[in-house]
Amino acid sequence: KPNDVVEPKLFDIINLDYPGLEKVKSFYEAGEHYYAAHALLEYYRNRTNVTNPNINLINPTISVKDQRIADQALEYRFYVRGFYESIDENKVETYYSFFDNNTKKIDWTAHQDTETDQEFRYQRHRHQWMLPQAKAYRISKDEKYIQSWIETYSDWLATYPYEPGTQFPPAGGSENDKDYEWKGLQVAERVLSQIDIMAYFIHSPNFTP
């Protein structure tokens, strides 16, 4: 497998001498980064000595709202907390579409002309629809949820790649509008949710290095 699908820096932050990572270390030291990543994935899939108290993988549940969020995301209607395109008499929300029918691509800047609240720009980079999709996958085992997640997350990473040298000015001021996708609560919420997302998705055949 090609090494170029794996970021080598991944291994710089992992203790390769940790018990259970012997295969990972062996592949890494041989320059086989893809196989090292695959061995790392197998380690996470099979380990039993770590429990995430936030989730229940044996009897997973999902709320009606989270199921709606997961399903709307399949159509590129992404849940952005506090914002929606419309709401009906039963308080069922329809979320904004981020799909550009002209380019047939995701438009991450969509609706900024109508939703001028700065919070809208921040919240959409917190990916609040991804955890509901992970829950929906764990319950249904329907690969469409992880395929949607992979497509969307890959597109976001391609659109907003992290660049070394991101500046973190004091709170407040227009300088916070620079690189805000990689600042503060945007990053914190993504990281916290990804811990749970990984556990829900990890046994999917589509979850690969």
Regions found by a protein language model. Give the residues of each.
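Extreme N-terminal leader/anchor segments
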Residues: 1-97
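Short, well-ordered helical secondary-structure segments
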Residues: 11, 15, 65, 111-116, ...
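Aromatic-lined, polymer-binding surfaces characteristic
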Residues: 96, 105, 112-209
